[in-house]
């Protein structure tokens, strides 16, 4: 028997995470995991299908992965804006893909769901979806969610929204924490069935992505915002990122007024540790075994908010989703990849072309941005790797699988990307 106690006045998430804790506890006993992830099946205009599962700490872009991208008035996607000059980089994505959401936040990877494909298979662990809507600041930002909340077919719960009982709640009217300062964490709880094109079965995962919020980074103000639009991770590095699970920059779910508020912090193993019981090393072993048992699933890393000196919000995530689905997946020849200057970032693609438009090289390899340069990049890389080394020490115990010891030791020894590939040679 499991008991769940919801002690605060925010009952939706508190009770939900209590149920998540139960699933993690049962999974730990039986050898499986409920992942902190959204999942979406993408069907391109060319009828190609790709399923992406996006993991990460709160604010890492899970809900955004299942959303249509936000077009400008001219129909293009605003990919990035130079924070110094104001120069905008836009891409034209003429025909958008159809999105079929599978999970929003909790992806059940039960053994009974797995098949012989060599890919991870998941199902939704939730009936209601708990959506953050801080990015919806005016009418027309996300028409699907706006329509569902303005004309609800079933009762919904609105949190941190400026509304009164019996009224129509406009989800871009967020309450204010102070005059002129909107609450960073407005939420809506809605039944999953009100989402369009919802998948009521399982999702067979082609790509597991991991999201991190990154700060602005320039040669004048070096920081860890050195991650390109997306990076390809060898499975060994994908596991490392899930152990450390950085919360990243300006996390809207975390209130921290201390002097260390801007410092990097970890959400804990799997990015679900705040809800787990037991030992971290047991969860680390389960995640490593899961990766080894699903060799046909590939791994990427996606930043949001900033790419070097460019502000992009979640546009890079949406562009990556559209690009990889049109490409038909992630299987790259190694000669088309560049080892990242910071080895825990895996590989970068040498070049990307979307609907005939070339993505600037500096958005793929941040050290190539003139406003960043190699010296500032290396300083940011040291911030990132030092944080990883500090976080990984707690897992290096006798209970960890031998392969896990080898992977962690490679991080501590500053090994190059090829070493991580050799430990689990799949790309």
Q: What feature does the model see in each segment?
A:
Residues 47-76:
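Glycine-rich phosphate-binding P-loop
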Residues 60-63, 73-75, 108-111, 129-132, ...:
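Flexible loop/turn segments at secondary-structure boundaries
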Residues 78, 83-178:
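Conserved nucleotide-sensing/catalytic segment adjacent to the nucleotide-binding pocket
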Residues 1-36:
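Charged, amphipathic alpha-helical linker segments immediately N-terminal to NTP-binding catalytic cores
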Residues 29, 46, 72-81, 90-96, ...:
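Secondary-structure transition/capping motifs at alpha-helix termini
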């Amino acid at each position: 028997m499991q008991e769940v106690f919801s002690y605060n006045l925010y009952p939706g998430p508190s009770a939900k995470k209590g149920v998540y804790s139960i699933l993690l506890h049962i999974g730990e006993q039986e050898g499986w995991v409920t992942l902190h992830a959204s999942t979406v099946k993408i069907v391109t205009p060319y009828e190609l299908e790709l399923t992406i599962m996006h993991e990460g700490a709160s604010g890492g872009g899970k809900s955004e992965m299942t959303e249509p991208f936000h077009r400008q008035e001219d129909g293009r996607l605003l990919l990035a804006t130079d924070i110094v000059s104001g120069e905008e980089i836009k891409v034209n994505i003429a025909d958008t893909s159809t999105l079929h959401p599978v999970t929003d936040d909790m992806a059940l990877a039960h053994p009974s769901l797995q098949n012989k494909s060599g890919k991870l298979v998941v199902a939704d662990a939730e009936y209601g979806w708990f959506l953050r809507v801080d990015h919806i600041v005016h009418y027309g930002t996300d028409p699907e969610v706006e329509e569902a909340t303005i004309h609800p077919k079933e009762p919904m719960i609105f949190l941190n929204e400026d509304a009164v009982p019996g009224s129509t709640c406009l989800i871009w009217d967020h309450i204010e924490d102070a005059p002129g300062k909107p609450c960073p964490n407005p939420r809506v709880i809605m039944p999953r069935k009100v989402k369009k094109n919802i998948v009521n079965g399982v999702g067979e995962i082609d790509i597991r992505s991991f999201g991190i919020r990154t700060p602005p980074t320039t040669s004048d103000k070096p920081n860890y915002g050195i991650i390109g639009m997306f990076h390809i991770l060898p499975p060994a590095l994908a596991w490392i990122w899930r152990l450390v699970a950085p919360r990243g920059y300006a996390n809207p779910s975390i209130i921290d007024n201390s002097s260390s508020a801007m410092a990097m912090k970890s959400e804990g193993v799997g990015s679900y540790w705040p809800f787990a019981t037991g030992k971290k090393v047991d969860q680390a072993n389960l995640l490593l075994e899961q990766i080894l048992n699903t060799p046909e699933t590939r791994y990427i890393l996606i930043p949001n908010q900033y790419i070097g000196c460019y502000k992009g919000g979640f546009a890079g995530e949406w562009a990556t989703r559209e690009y990889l689905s049109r490409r038909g997946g992630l299987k790259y020849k190694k000669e088309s990849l560049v080892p990242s200057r910071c080895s825990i970032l895996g590989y970068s693609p040498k070049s990307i072309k979307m609907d005939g438009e070339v993505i600037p090289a500096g958005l793929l390899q941040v050290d190539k941005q003139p406003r960043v340069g190699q010296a500032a990049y290396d300083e940011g890389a040291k911030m990132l790797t030092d944080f990883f080394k500090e976080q990984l020490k707690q897992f290096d115990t006798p209970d960890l699988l031998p392969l896990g010891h080898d992977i962690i030791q490679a991080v501590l020894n500053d090994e190059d990307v090829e070493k991580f590939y050799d430990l689990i040679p799949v790309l």
